[in-house]
Amino acid sequence: MRLYRDEAVVVRQHKLGEADRIVTLLTRQHGLVRAVAKGVRRTRSRFGARLEPFSYIDVQLHPGRNLDTVTQVHTVESFAADIIDDYGRYTTACAILETAERLAGEERAPAPKLHALTASALRAIAAKQRPHELVLDAYLLRAMRFAGWAPALDECAKCATPGPHRAFHVAAGGAVCVHCRPPGAATPAPGVLDHLVALARGEWAGIEAVPESTRKQASGLVAAHLQWHLERQLRTLPLIERSGPARDAATAGHAG
């Protein structure tokens, strides 16, 4: 079979035998790819450091029956140094990679939009110009849109009546009007849903001035909505600090 080349975000890796690793890549053209990187754990490996998570690489692979094999790799951008030196940025970036892997779907199913979004999110976290938790929430909202799970924010999830609305219910699909509001719906504080709309649209002007309590409650709703659709909790999200109001809102939205 012919070699192929692609650009990829390194999502994760784990040991294989004494000297090899299996790397999980989110590629631009081929979606999620798992490949063996032979000998990378040896001191003299040609490209071991280039296959660390948070790297953006140009990689050449040889197709295999179950796993491909990395034959060449060049670093395009390395975000790791500017991410791992801060716990908040590190856990946020880990949550982005875990989400990307979960949303990418079947292996080799092209996901160019998710690939580009993931690379952009890591780049933004490494740049340190915006709060990492806001980058994460914007990423999750847009990634869910690509998956077809975007929460309704400025119209009722049930009847499509234009908002603004005051209630949010995860199982209903997001914001709900007074007529469609199911039992157990959360009532976010004023400004929370507007904040989520701005994040989803990438309207960054003024976002950082939003009160911390509003931002944290919005984060809780985003996390609850994502994990309800995934039908399981992401391992990395609990490592990112959430305030009491965010957890309360997420729990209420999940009920019923």
UniProtKB/Swiss-Prot annotation:
Gene3D superfamilies: Nucleic acid-binding proteins (2.40.50.140), Recombination protein O, C-terminal domain (1.20.1440.120). Keywords: DNA damage, DNA recombination, DNA repair. GO terms for biological process: DNA recombination; double-strand break repair. InterPro entries: ARFGAP/RecO, DNA_rep/recomb_RecO_N, NA-bd_OB-fold, RecO, RecO_C. Involved in DNA repair and RecF pathway recombination. Belongs to the RecO family. This is DNA repair protein RecO. It comes from Nocardia farcinica (strain IFM 10152). The gene is recO.
